[in-house]
Design a protein with these regions (language model features):
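Asp-based phosphoryl-transfer active-site loop
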Residues: 1-2
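Metal-dependent phosphodiesterase/phospholipase catalytic core, i.e.
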Residues: 6, 11-159, 173-174, 179-182, ...
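C-terminal active-site rim and adjoining tail of enzyme catalytic domains
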Residues: 154, 161-236
Length: 236
């Protein structure tokens, strides 16, 4: 969300010097620039779509094809596209980025949800949208403001190099406090919260919990499965 309350499509809370160029085409150097502290007009002066050479990103994604000169889009830019008749079969999985570990990088959940719902309603996409979040406060707020939009609960039960788990005993990410024994059966928790989708990290998937999710009528969305052997395991 920009300083002037415009939802954008961007993965991070800050502009990344390894991925972002300024209006002159130079790689930025300031690591502290938060989107929430920039107006959308200011954000639109930066370009993305390529990776700075010799960085960890460049080494990790050697085959990535750059799309130079791309701008950070407004959420409504995308909504305009999918609202066209030729894209009426497109269904949206919209993740709202919110965090408990960093201060002042987004508005509060109530405001974020309100701003995004306004755009969804404007383009009549309520029946074509699933909203997911790692921060379950967002999903609680969504249910309050519009219970008709599908809600997907993102879960991570192990720490990753770039992301810490959100499922653990008495986790604040989950809003309510759950004892350890209940966390082994996450679909039960999501069902009790009237969720629609369980969005689970692929290494946390078990056959027992997938079967339990299906029993509860929950769709299971697994992230992120790139290797063939993992794809086969997920299918099985």
């Amino acid at each position: 969300i920009s300083k002037d309350n415009i939802p954008t499509i961007f993965h991070d809370y800050r502009l990344n010097p390894d991925l972002v160029k300024d209006a002159s085409g130079n790689w930025i150097t300031d690591k502290s620039m938060k989107l929430v502290e920039l107006t959308y007009e200011e954000i639109s002066k930066y370009t993305i779509g390529s990776v700075k050479p010799e960085t960890k990103y460049a080494k990790r994604f050697k085959n990535q094809k750059p799309i130079k000169g791309e701008k950070i889009p407004k959420l409504t830019d995308f909504f305009k596209l999918v609202a066209e008749d030729k894209h009426k079969d497109v269904f949206l999985n919209l993740e709202i980025k919110s965090t408990l570990t960093q201060e002042n990088v987004t508005p509060n959940p109530e405001k974020m949800v309100s701003l995004i719902l306004k755009d969804i309603k404007e383009y009549d996409l309520e029946n074509r949208t699933l909203i997911t979040s790692y921060d379950w406060r967002i999903l609680y707020e969504l249910k309050k403001q519009n219970p008709n939009i599908l809600r997907g609960f993102i879960t991570l039960q192990q720490d990753l190099p770039t992301t810490k788990k959100n499922v653990y005993e008495n986790s604040p990410w989950m809003v309510k406090k759950y004892p350890m024994e209940e966390l082994f059966l996450l679909p039960n928790i999501i069902k009790s919260l009237e969720g629609h989708v369980w969005s689970v990290f692929y290494r946390d998937v078990t056959k027992q919990n997938v079967e339990l999710a299906h029993k509860h009528g929950l769709a299971t969305c697994v992230w992120t499965v790139n290797r063939e052997k993992d794809i086969i395991r997920m299918i099985e």
